């Protein structure tokens, strides 16, 4: 007759479970690793969504808005009613200033077919009739153009460096 086994797991069973957990953790780490292209596309889409929202808000509220990008962040502006001064938009979470990923830059590229300086402010009119404009997002060997057409549809396309 054999002695009864003590309850619990054998060493082999414990090692098999540890091996399975290690393999799963390795697969998860590879899957969650930050892909530079995905980061750039996410930043560009986030900016494109804010541009479409700003163009619609300019029409809804009958106000002239503007957008600028200084390389590290973008910001939306509202033209003061009494002058040509631009005031930072502070009453809207979507249009609040946003920083972009550390290894990326965002600058204006063109407005109405003309190249722009890096400190340019692009207007978004209350009529909805805006000139085509574009911004360029560079980083990690990736260059994306965020462009708007006259109907305020914003697209993100890969550009040749």
Model-derived features: where do they sit?
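N-terminal helix-rich module
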Residues: 1-3, 12, 16, 23-49, ...
